């Protein structure tokens, strides 16, 4: 184990963010580089070698958390990296973007602050890159089998890397102009700089994975013909259909889905645009949706120079501590203040948008809302609470409803969907079409990055078995597995 008394003698410390007045002037990551290095070994030493490490249960990847905590405490960073990469293809992604359900399940968290697992994870992998310990792992021999992966988000990349390393010839198809999917254009630079994606792509290229950008399967290439060219296909196209808000005034200019707004800001950072085509500069911004995507819109609006930012959520404000209905080790829905919220803006809970109001030129100017209260699980408007707030830019960040059907991919392959609009699959990630598998949000629905990577790894094993009759690849989860909850 790590330090036998660490959890008794050392308090929890988390990564420190840069001052607000500094970071809102740039798009760099909000955390101070290397801020935890002097204390990270002691933080890893707080891991208490509990009899049953529930952090394993909280993490769908099955990360070997006590093991790499022990190595980090001892200063054996190469061994820590090896154990970390044994279960996770991209720990620098999860270490920056995952909400850390492993920490919610940490046994120490029953009566103390949990171990800073996420901070230890990202420190291990960053040090591994700096030391040159992250290298390509090309296969020893090729199988002669070919696989097409549709989509280059975390699920697609994980599946592609696992299958390439198993000896198959893999091509990843991405409809955008760069590889990365949601990681590339949906995650702001201040949460994860894209250099982390770029170096992983170079690693994968060196291993033999092929990438095809600006190719939309179903529109540019017939999906059925693609299936005929490859021995297997993995659909990892995500759940990209945004939930809309069909209220009067929705057609006004200045109202955008979050996934219209955020990619434009990211393209500016990539150097594609001098200035964003959708900008919050000098505007009163309203973000509808209280989740992480909404917070990303808030932080982006701050950096673009918004006059004001208001985030609306129809649900009541969550509590700050676990309730009896969210006991340990479940992943609780708690009130949290992200780095974007630290930077300013107002958060309003228990409200519903009734309609938008525009000017004579058809541009949105006001958002009308009303307070709601829930009865029998349904929101009911409270009479007399109607009001309007200025809104010159509105972003809709209310989640996603399923995989994209507009490009013809689903129909051309003849894929069946489940009741939630996701691609249906069996216990082996196989769809109703022989040789076609599905991984990530396309099959699971909107979820977390850690689940996407776990699905990509698990689907890769299923594909490997389909192609060769057996597989030594790991499969951390089944398609029906869900987060530990009540």
Label each region the model flagged.
Residues 251-282, 375-446:
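FAD-site-proximal beta/loop scaffold in flavoenzymes
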Residues 81-88, 101, 120, 183-231, ...:
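N-terminal Rossmann-like dinucleotide/flavin-binding domain of flavoprotein oxidoreductases
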Residues 79, 141-142, 146-150, 198-247, ...:
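Feature captures the FAD/FMN-dependent oxidoreductase FAD-binding
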Residues 320-323, 444, 464-486:
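Active-site-proximal substrate-binding core of FAD-dependent oxidoreductases
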Residues 294-299, 304, 439-473:
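A conserved FAD-binding loop/helix module that cradles the flavin
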Residues 146-171, 293-304:
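N-terminal Rossmann-like FAD-binding beta1-loop-alpha1 element of flavoenzymes
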Residues 168-184, 309-319:
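Glycine-rich FAD pyrophosphate-binding loop
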Residues 23-43, 63-96, 100, 111-141, ...:
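Ferredoxin-type iron-sulfur electron-transfer modules in oxidoreductases and energy-metabolism complexes
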């Amino acid at each position: 184990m790590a330090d036998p008394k660490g959890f008794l003698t050392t308090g929890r410390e988390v990564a420190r963010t840069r001052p607000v007045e500094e970071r809102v002037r740039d798009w760099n990551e909000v955390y101070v580089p290397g801020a935890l290095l002097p204390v990270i070994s002691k933080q890893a030493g707080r891991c208490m070698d509990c009899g049953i490490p529930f952090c394993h249960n909280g993490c769908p990847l099955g990360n070997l958390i006590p093991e790499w905590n022990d190595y980090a405490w001892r200063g054996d960073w190469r061994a820590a990296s090896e154990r970390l990469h044994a279960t996770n293809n991209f720990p620098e992604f999860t270490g920056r973007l995952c909400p850390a359900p492993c920490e919610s399940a940490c046994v120490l968290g029953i009566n103390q602050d949990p171990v800073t697992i996420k901070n230890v994870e990202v420190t291990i992998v960053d040090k591994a890159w700096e030391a040159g310990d992250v290298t390509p792992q090309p296969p020893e021999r090729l199988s002669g089998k070919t696989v097409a992966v549709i989509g280059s988000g975390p699920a697609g990349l994980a599946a592609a890397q696992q299958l390439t390393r198993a000896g198959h010839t893999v091509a990843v198809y991405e409809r955008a102009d760069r590889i990365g999917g949601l990681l590339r254009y949906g995650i702001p630079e201040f949460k994860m700089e894209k250099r982390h994606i770029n170096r992983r792509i170079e690693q994968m290229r060196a291993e033999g994975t092929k990438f095809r950008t600006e190719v939309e399967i179903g529109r540019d290439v017939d999906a059925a013909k693609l299936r005929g060219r490859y021995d297997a296909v993995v659909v990892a196209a995500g759940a990209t259909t945004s939930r809309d808000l069909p209220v009067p005034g929705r057609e006004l200019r200045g109202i955008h889905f979050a996934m219209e707004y955020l990619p434009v800001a990211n393209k500016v950072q990539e150097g594609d645009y001098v200035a964003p085509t959708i900008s919050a500069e000098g505007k009163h911004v309203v973000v509808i949706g209280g989740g992480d995507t909404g917070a990303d819109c808030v932080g982006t609006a701050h950096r673009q120079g918004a006059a004001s930012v208001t985030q609306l959520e129809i649900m009541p404000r969550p509590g700050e501590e676990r309730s009896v209905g969210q006991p340990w080790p479940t992943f609780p829905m708690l009130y949290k203040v992200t780095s974007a919220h630290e930077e300013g803006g107002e958060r309003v809970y228990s409200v519903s948008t009734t309609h938008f109001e525009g000017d004579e030129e058809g541009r949105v100017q006001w958002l009308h809302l009303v307070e709601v209260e829930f009865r029998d699980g349904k929101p009911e408007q409270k009479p007399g609470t109607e009001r309007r707030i200025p809104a010159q830019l509105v972003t809709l960040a209310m989640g996603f409803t399923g995989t994209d059907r507009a490009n013809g991919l689903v129909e051309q392959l003849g894929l069946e969907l489940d009741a939630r609009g996701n691609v249906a699959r069996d216990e082996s990630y196989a769809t109703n079409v022989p040789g076609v598998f599905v991984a990530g949000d396309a099959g699971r629905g909107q979820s977390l990055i850690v689940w996407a990577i776990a699905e990509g790894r698990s689907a890769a094993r299923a594909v490997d078995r389909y192609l060769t009759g057996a597989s030594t690849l790991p499969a951390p989860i089944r398609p029906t597995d869900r987060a530990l909850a009540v």
